[in-house]
From Swiss-Prot:
Binding partners and assembly: Associates with the 50S ribosomal subunit.
Organism (species): Thermosipho africanus (strain TCF52B)
Residue ranges of every copy of the EngA-type G domain listed in the record: 2-167, 182-358
Keyword Cytoplasm appears in the UniProt entry: no
Keywords from the UniProt entry: GTP-binding, Nucleotide-binding, Repeat, Ribosome biogenesis
Binding-site residues for GTP 1, renumbered to this chain: 8-15, 55-59, 118-121
Annotated KH-like domain residues: 359-439
Matches recorded under Gene3D superfamilies: 3.30.300.20, P-loop containing nucleotide triphosphate hydrolases
Domain of life: Bacteria
Gene Ontology biological process terms, A to Z: ribosome biogenesis
Protein name: GTPase Der
Binding-site residues, GTP 2: 188-195, 235-239, 301-304
Organism lineage string: Bacteria, Thermotogati, Thermotogota, Thermotogae, Thermotogales
GO molecular function list: GTP binding; ribosome binding
UniProt family annotation: Belongs to the TRAFAC class TrmE-Era-EngA-EngB-Septin-like GTPase superfamily. EngA (Der) GTPase family.
Length: 439
């Protein structure tokens, strides 16, 4: 599918334009400069035409820190990979030296360019800045207001025309594709190695990796085909403790996006920093994924930094069973994302967890196993479980009819254990139980 890259200096409204084009708020928008760091991608559907759109970090002529410099390098690298560039400028505040600097860089890419003059609400300001806009050398701009949605359809039509003139196909069966994609999010504390793992699986630098916790702010996704199977991998911002997050801060927005990514996933990979071990925040993250009915995989990363790891592996397994006992049905994977070790095992675990999430068992098998369970371990006094059946998938959900007595939590856990050990293991998938009175 063709890819369109949004490029411009900081704070010209690239992320607002991106969100308007894809039809929902995916890129974080804030008045501060340099909010977008990674390349955030989405899909634009316009009647029967579809294409990918990528929001990039603002390019500074003289970056002030290492993160902004790496963001600039990532954007420059993508200039030659895209099929079309949207060069976004600010019609409200006029053309600056940074715009001319960026125009020279874009020209060197020899790519097709559409000049987009954003913040064009004021006709007077547009007219005042028109001579400088044409000096950029990219011909007639399209004047838009991403904030108000002005001329967005005109911009999309221009994009479609340019892409089709290059012989690129914009036709795709979105319904068929969406049904076959496994959606996987990487969740964890800041600096657990999520972005390194994301880049290692993609086999290219797609998101920034630095030793500084919290480098990733947006949730960044990429569609990948591995062994004929499609995966949508999502790298998320590290989830910070609530007590450390100002409700008005960018970290708050990042936390919200990360939780939203969990909700939109089939499989959640909970990435643990092997050096620090499982923390209370990791437990909280696991609880969020379980409560939302997502398949989970627990992965210890950075094992390359653990001396004599093979002799300490059992310690990590014990730590998993002790601190993440409530998702002990999850596959446990050991990784070195930076060295690309353990990634094949991770992909296999994702496949197995996805299968479990969608698996259905026969009603006869459920009742046979539950009757045997009750014969060996009778329910609490006064409680009768009459029969049960699986009523849903994603997650596997079972409905049991009872005589109306409340089923205590310990006995619910016993039912789940019986299902896993005697019917189907549902590796990686939580089992939800419902109870209904039938007199």
């Amino acid at each position: 599918m063709p890819t369109v890259l949004i490029v411009g200096k900081s704070n010209v409204g690239k992320s607002t334009l991106f969100n308007k084009l894809i039809g929902y708020k995916k890129s974080i928008v804030d008045d501060k400069e340099g909010v977008t760091r990674d390349a955030v991608s989405g899909r634009v559907s316009y009647y029967s035409k579809t294409f990918n759109i990528v929001d990039t970090g603002g390019i500074f002529e003289n970056p002030e820190d290492d993160i902004i410099n790496k963001s600039k390098d990532l954007t420059l690298k993508m200039l030659n990979e895209a099929d079309l560039i949207l060069f976004v400028i600010d019609a409200k505040n006029g053309i600056t030296s940074e715009d001319y600097y960026l125009a020279d860089i874009i020209r060197k890419s020899n790519n097709d360019v559409i000049l987009v003059s954003n913040k064009s609400e004021s006709e007077r300001r547009v007219q005042n800045n028109l001579p400088d806009i044409y000096k950029l050398g990219f011909g007639d701009p399209i004047f838009v207001s991403a904030e108000q949605g002005k001329n967005i359809d005109t911009l999309i039509e221009r994009i479609v025309n340019v892409l089709e003139s290059k012989g690129l196909s914009l036709e795709e069966n979105l319904k068929e594709e969406s049904q076959s994609i496994i959606r996987v999010s990487f969740i964890g504390r800041p600096n657990a190695g999520k972005s390194t793992l994301f880049n290692s699986i993609l086999n290219k630098e797609r998101v920034l990796v630095t030793p500084i916790p919290g480098t990733t702010r947006d949730s960044v996704d990429e569609l990948v085909t591995i062994n004929g199977r499609k995966y949508l991998f999502v790298d998320t911002a590290g989830l910070r403790r609530k007590s450390k997050v100002d409700y008005k801060s960018l970290d708050m927005y990042s936390n919200v996006r990360s939780i939203k990514s969990i909700e939109n996933s089939d499989v959640v990979v909970i990435l643990i920093d092997a050096i620090e071990g499982i923390t209370h925040q990791d437990q909280r993250i696991a609880g969020i994924a379980e409560n939302r009915g997502k398949a989970t995989i627990v992965a210890f990363n950075k094992i390359d930094l653990i001396k004599n790891f093979k002799y300490k592996k059992e310690e990590f397994i014990d730590q998993f069973n002790e601190k993440l006992y409530f998702i002990n049905y999850s596959p446990l994977i050991f990784l070195s994302a930076i060295n690309k070790k353990g990634i094949d095992n991770l992909i296999n675990a994702i496949d197995e967890a996805y299968k479990s999430l969608h698996y259905r068992v026969q009603t006869s098998a459920v009742n046979s196993a539950i009757q045997r369970m009750m014969a060996f371990t009778p329910p609490p006094k006064g409680l009768k479980i009459l029969y049960g059946t699986q009523v849903d998938i994603r997650p596997p959900t079972f409905l049991f009819f009872t005589n109306g007595k409340k089923v205590p939590e310990f006995y619910q856990n016993h039912i789940r254990k019986t299902i896993r050990e005697n019917i189907y293991p549902f590796v990686g998938a939580p089992i939800f139980l419902k109870f209904k009175s039938r007199h």
